[in-house]
Curated annotation (Swiss-Prot):
InterPro entries the record matches: NA-bd_OB-fold (IPR012340), Ribosomal_uS17 (IPR000266), Ribosomal_uS17_bact/chlr (IPR019984), Ribosomal_uS17_CS (IPR019979)
Gene transcribed to yield this protein: rpsQ
Family the entry assigns: Belongs to the universal ribosomal protein uS17 family.
Record-linked CDD domains: Ribosomal_uS17 (cd00364)
Organism: Acinetobacter baylyi (strain ATCC 33305 / BD413 / ADP1)
Lineage: Bacteria, Pseudomonadati, Pseudomonadota, Gammaproteobacteria, Moraxellales
Presence of the UniProt keyword Nucleotide-binding in the record: no
Biological role: One of the primary rRNA binding proteins, it binds specifically to the 5'-end of 16S ribosomal RNA.
UniProt name for this protein: Small ribosomal subunit protein uS17
Amino acid sequence: MSEKTVRTLTGKVVSDKMDKSIVVLIERRVQHPLYGKSIRRSTKLHAHDENNVAKLGDLVTIKESRPISKTKAWTLVEVVEVAAE
C-alpha cells in the first residue's frame, strides 16, 4: 500500500474563543502574474484543538484531517512558539 502524505501548514492563531477550536491565519507570498511584484496572500483555517492548548498569537502547526464539522477539516499538531504576554 502506498502511504499518503499529510499536508501540514504553519500559521498564527487569530482566534481561540471557541471551545476546542482555533482560527489560524496562514500567510504566503505569491508573485503578481503581470507585474511580478511579490504580494502577501492569507487564508484563515479553522482547526480542532482538543485540549485548548493554543492561545491567541501563538505560532502553530496544523495538519489536514477528515472533516470534523462544516468548517473544520484541520487538526492542531503542535504549538511551535508561544506568544509573548
